[in-house]
């Protein structure tokens, strides 16, 4: 591309600012790197987008958890600063903003269960899966760390000191099921909520269904997460995202909560907020593909398609 201006591009008494800007050379940033930094960052943009997307999700979501719960203590605030509705709004807004930031770059998975489902059933490259999941998990750790630093003094007041850390405040960062829940019911709750999540995601991405207009997806996800929280969130805290739970859980283990965050209910952390969402996303995708999806990448649509019966 020739980056020199011709005579007509030079400003004169009859040239307006807009005319001059219109004649400036245009660079195709999708194929041309104007500097070394642009070239070096290109292979990592998708992973960094997932990292930031999850970090933003956690900042809004865990931040809302902390504000609602910690402000209920009179030593922290004179009156409560929120409710269960505002808590759900925090997670819904966090999801919407996280997808808005990362959607045009990485696809806006911000959830390992979604990434694995897309790789299994929608042709997402398998070689990207480990990097995506690592970036998502790291985003969960960093996002939770930022919220922890922001609310550390309020946590100290609620706990009774800087070096006292119990599951009461650990629950602000990761999910811990209600005492009355059985192990099976905990697993089913996360499985069901994640299946609903992925079914709606596939419906939004299905061009033969009713996909939302460009740029509207984050708003749809806002109402989706708000609805899941309002209907299925009370019993387990609706992790529905392994990075959302495991990242902050690892952060709490590192800042003083110790092994108790992993020992809760016989390693609850792995089979409920991690394995259940992975399985729920897979089964939810199978359900959508079996009964609704007509895309060429539908595995069930290809079964037996090579068989042709000729008339006698």
From Swiss-Prot:
Gene induction: Expression is high in vegetative mycelia and highly up-regulated during development of the basidiocarp. Expression is positively correlated with root abscisic acid (ABA) content during ectomycorrhizal interaction with poplar trees.
Cytoplasmic topological domain: 1-50, 111-128, 205-213, 289-312
One Pfam family it belongs to: MIP
InterPro entries: Aquaporin-like, MIP, MIP/Aquaporin, MIP_CS
Signal peptide (UniProt feature, chain positions): none
Residue intervals on the Extracellular side: 72-89, 150-183, 235-267
Highest taxon above the source species: Eukaryota
Residues passing through the membrane, by range: 51-71, 90-110, 129-149, 184-204, 214-234, 268-288
GO CC terms, sorted: plasma membrane
Keywords: Glycoprotein, Membrane, Repeat, Transmembrane, Transmembrane helix, Transport
Residue positions of motif NPA 1: 111-113
Major site of localization recorded for this protein: membrane
Cellular compartment(s): Membrane
Known glycosylation sites: 183
Motif NPA 2: positions: 241-243
GO MF: glycerol channel activity; water channel activity
Its job: Water channel required to facilitate the transport of water across membranes. Does not mediate the transport carbon dioxide nor nitric oxide across the membrane. Plays a key role in root water transport of mycorrhizal plant such ectomycorrhizal white spruce or trembling aspen via the hydration at the hyphal-root interphase. Contributes in fungal cellular processes during the basidiocarp formation.
Free-text note on domains in this protein's UniProt record: Aquaporins contain two tandem repeats each containing three membrane-spanning domains and a pore-forming loop with the signature motif Asn-Pro-Ala (NPA).
Family note: Belongs to the MIP/aquaporin (TC 1.A.8) family.
Protein name: Aquaporin-6
Organism in which the protein naturally occurs: Laccaria bicolor
Gene that specifies this protein: AQP6
């Amino acid at each position: 591309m020739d980056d020199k201006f011709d005579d007509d591009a030079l400003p004169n008494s009859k040239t307006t600012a807009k005319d001059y800007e219109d004649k400036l050379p245009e660079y195709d940033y999708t194929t041309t790197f104007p500097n070394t930094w642009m070239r070096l960052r290109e292979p990592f943009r998708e992973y960094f987008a997932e990292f930031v997307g999850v970090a933003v999700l956690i900042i809004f979501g865990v931040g809302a958890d902390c504000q609602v719960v910690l402000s209920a203590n009179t030593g922290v605030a004179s009156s409560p600063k929120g409710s269960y509705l505002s808590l759900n709004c925090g997670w819904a807004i966090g999801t919407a903003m996280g997808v808005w930031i990362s959607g045009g770059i990485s696809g806006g998975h911000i959830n390992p269960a979604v990434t694995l489902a897309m790789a299994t059933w929608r042709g997402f490259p398998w070689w990207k899966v480990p990097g995506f999941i690592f970036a998502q998990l790291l985003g969960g750790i960093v996002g939770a760390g930022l919220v922890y630093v922001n609310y550390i003094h309020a946590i100290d007041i609620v706990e009774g000191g800087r070096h006292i850390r119990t599951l009461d405040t650990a629950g602000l960062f990761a999910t811990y099921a209600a005492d009355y829940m059985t192990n099976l019911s905990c697993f089913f709750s996360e499985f069901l909520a994640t299946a609903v999540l992925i079914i709606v995601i596939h419906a939004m991405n299905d061009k033969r269904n009713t996909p939302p207009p460009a740029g509207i997806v984050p708003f749809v996800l806002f109402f989706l997460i708000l609805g899941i929280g309002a209907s299925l969130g009370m019993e387990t805290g609706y992790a529905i995202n392994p990075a959302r739970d495991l990242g902050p859980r690892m952060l709490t283990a590192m800042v003083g909560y110790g092994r108790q965050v992993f020992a809760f209910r016989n390693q609850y952390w792995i089979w409920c907020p991690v394995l259940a969402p992975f399985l729920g996303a897979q089964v939810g995708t199978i359900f959508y593909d079996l009964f609704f999806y007509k895309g060429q990448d539908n595995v069930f649509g290809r079964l037996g398609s090579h068989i042709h019966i000729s008339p006698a």
